[in-house]
Amino acid sequence: MSLSTEAKAKILADFGRCENDTGSTEVQVALLTAQINHLQAHFKEHIHDHHSRRGLLRMVSSRRKLTAYLKRTDLARYTALIQKLGLRR
């Protein structure tokens, strides 16, 4: 249930600050969002997959913490990221 290498490379190209940027907050949030969206599609078919649902909740919590950090440190980058990903907040 992980993302393909091509999907990760596309996210890195879209959200990374430079070519090899894999650790910036924007990239981490974008990767988590893609994984969360992938898992949501999985749960439409597999409703009772509680083991994976726990992992989904962990990813959502991690994304929430990262977006809160970004909002606290750089509001302009936060608002740009939220608009680009289409997240609520």
UniProtKB/Swiss-Prot annotation:
SMART domains: Ribosomal_S15
Coiled-coil annotated spans: none
CDD domains the record matches: Ribosomal_S15p_S13e (cd00353)
Superkingdom, natural source: Bacteria
GO biological process: translation
Gene3D superfamilies membership: 6.10.250.3130, S15/NS1, RNA-binding
UniProt entry tagged with the keyword Nucleotide-binding: no
A cellular component annotation (GO) from this entry: cytosolic small ribosomal subunit
Pfam families named in the record: Ribosomal_S15
Keyword Nucleus belongs to the record: no
Stored InterPro entries: Ribosomal_uS15 (IPR000589), Ribosomal_uS15_bac-type (IPR005290), uS15_NS1_RNA-bd_sf (IPR009068)
GO molecular function: rRNA binding; structural constituent of ribosome
Keywords: Ribonucleoprotein, Ribosomal protein, RNA-binding, rRNA-binding
NCBIfam families: S15_bact
Listed HAMAP family: Ribosomal_uS15_B (MF_01343_B)
Subunit composition and interactions: Part of the 30S ribosomal subunit. Forms a bridge to the 50S subunit in the 70S ribosome, contacting the 23S rRNA.
Function: One of the primary rRNA binding proteins, it binds directly to 16S rRNA where it helps nucleate assembly of the platform of the 30S subunit by binding and bridging several RNA helices of the 16S rRNA.
Family under the similarity heading: Belongs to the universal ribosomal protein uS15 family.
Protein's name according to its UniProt entry: Small ribosomal subunit protein uS15
Organism, scientific name: Shewanella baltica (strain OS185)
